[in-house]
């Protein structure tokens, strides 16, 4: 199970021979919507951390915006939770309720 949030410094490519994208979950500990969404996110990550989507490996990163405001600012996060996909060429915001099926569809459609 994923514990807590990562900092921007925890982001790395653990799969150097694959094309890698990053899916960020931006939240804060005090947000009730983040607390509600976090278990669904963690379950989705657990189910998909070793899979590829359309040939691309996805790094899943939780960001605590209170502790890593620079990363939140970089991705223009203004509300919580916010989920964004960074493909290297584009940043795409996920605009649905963070549920496993919707996240899977988002990655399949975006990559």
Please tell me what each predicted stretch does.
Residues 73-78:
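A short glycine-leucine-enriched loop at secondary-structure breakpoints
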Residues 13-50:
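Local sequence-structure signature of Cys/Sec-based thiol-disulfide redox active-site neighborhoods
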Residues 1-10:
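N-terminal targeting signals for export/organelle localization
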Residues 79-111:
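Non-catalytic, surface beta->alpha helical segment in thiol-disulfide oxidoreductase systems
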Residues 26, 45, 50-70, 97:
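Thiol-based oxidoreductase modules, predominantly thioredoxin-like and allied folds used
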Residues 28-30, 67, 90:
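Conserved beta-strand elements of beta-rich interaction domains across eukaryotes
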Residues 36, 40-43, 70, 98, ...:
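Extracytoplasmic/secreted proteins, especially bacterial periplasmic and envelope-associated proteins
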């Amino acid at each position: 199970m994923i514990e807590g949030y990562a900092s921007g410094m925890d982001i790395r490519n653990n799969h150097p021979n694959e094309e890698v994208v990053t899916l960020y979950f931006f939240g804060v500990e005090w947000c009730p919507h983040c607390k509600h969404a976090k278990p669904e996110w963690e379950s989705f990550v657990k189910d998909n951390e070793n899979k590829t989507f359309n040939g691309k490996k996805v790094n899943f990163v939780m960001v605590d915006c209170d502790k890593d405001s620079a990363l939140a600012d970089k991705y223009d996060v203004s509300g919580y939770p916010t989920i964004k996909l960074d493909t290297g060429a584009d940043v795409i915001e996920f605009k649905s309720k963070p549920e496993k099926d919707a996240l899977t569809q988002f990655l399949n459609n975006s990559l």
